[in-house]
Every structure is written in structure tokens, then in C-alpha cells.
Amino acid sequence: MENIERELKIVELYKQGITQKQICKECKCSTNTISDVIDKYNIPRRAKRKKNKDLSKFKDYSLPETQYWIGYICADGNIQYDKNNRVYKVSLFSKEEEPINKFVKYFGEDTVSVHRRPTGIIEAYINSKELCEYFIQVYNIVPNKSNILNPSVGFTTNFILGYFDGDGCIRNSSEKQIRYECNITCGSKIFLEKIMNILDKQGIYSILYQHTDCLAYKIRIDRKADSEKFYKWLYKDAVVCLSRKLNNFVALYGNIENSKLGELQEFEGESAAKLKE
């Protein structure tokens, strides 16, 4: 194997999360060579593996905040289960600091690692075969889930809020036009139909349609009265949320009765500072 080809392969395997032992075996190199190559190509070093991981919160779906984060992972997360390369990882992705900080704070710094990609995406992840298997076997949240997402969990308000914070949006208003439209996007029609049925039972009118430029589907709530109902229903029992989206709703409809919401609107600056260290 030419040196340049081997270096590029080392870089690719390292970025995929393949263990150094496996990289050494496949590329016939030493760990020192791996270190030299990733430094040469300015690849950020991976966080050291966590030895004292506590997975109990992930497995206790009765906890409202766990419901929220399972929903968020369904939207903007990934399960990597690769027996051949021994890579087992549950990840959550965001361009924003806030959800990453809150995720780490809830599940613990001894459990969650954080990786900043050159693209600006931040990944919070847990390396654990046990956790991956729990997600797959118990929650039915599988690798490459986008178009087949159909988790076997309760679709609580906190779960739906977590999904909405990951893959939902509120149309931006302007000085000339106030918009009330809310959207929830997913590649799985079955998943969105379940949410739509729940909204219907709450008297919230919504429309389900397929994007014309891709395979994804979208729930749209565009009437002012229904958008306001959706907001009040979605956040009534919230224990954690993305403050940016909450503030957009508050700007349209004002505050609702939930003693936690004032705290939820505050960005956790101390956690952000710690994450940047």
C-alpha cells in the first residue's frame, strides 16, 4: 500500500471511530504511526474512553427528561453497531451548544464524550455495546433509522418535544408578516402518523404530506389557533427543551403556566464554558 493511500485510510478509519488496535491490524502500522498521521492531517483527537459509564437513566423511560432525549436521538441522533470493526456508539448531533451541554449535564460527564467536527457539528456520544443493544432490542431504535423509524416507546409530550427540538421548526416571522406555521419532519411516514393521531386527539388540526424533492414527510400545523394549542400542549409538562424554539413560541403567544419554563429559557453558560475548555 502506498504511503499516501495508507495515511488516508488511517484517517478515514480513525474518523469512523475504529479502534486503534483494529487500525493497526488493517493498515499494518503502529499506534505511533496513527498518532503521527492524525496530527499531520489536523484530525482532532478522540476523547478517551469513559470507564465509569452510568447507563441507568437511558434505560429508565419513566423519567420525563429521558423521554425527551430519546425523542431527540430519534431526530438528530445515530446508533452505530458494527461488529466487524467493534464500533458501538450512540450519538446525538447539533450545531448548537445548548442541547449538547444539557445532554452531558443530564447523563453525566463520566458517561458522555464530546467531539467537535471541523464542519461545526458537535457530537455527544456514548461508546457502549450494551447501550446500543438496549436501543435496538428494547426501544426499536436501530442503525440507519431515518426512513424506518418506529420506536416502541410511549409517545409522551416530552418525547415529542425532544423530537420537535431535533427535527421540528417554527416558521420565522418578519415585520411585514407574522407566521404561525409549525413543522415536524421525518423520513418515516408511520412515525409521523402516530404523532398526527395524538395531535388529532388533542384537537390540533395538522396536515401530513411528502416533500417533492426527497423521500421525507412533514406534519404541518399552520392555523394560528392550532399552533397555539400545539405550543401549550407540547410545553405544559416540559422539564427540558431548546430555549430558542421555546422563545419563538413565547414571542407569538406569551408564557404558559409551567414553573420550569423560566429556567428552561436560560442558556446554561457555565456548562458551555466547561464544554469549551
Predicted regions and their residues:
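Internal intein/HINT superfamily modules and their associated LAGLIDADG
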Residues: 1-277
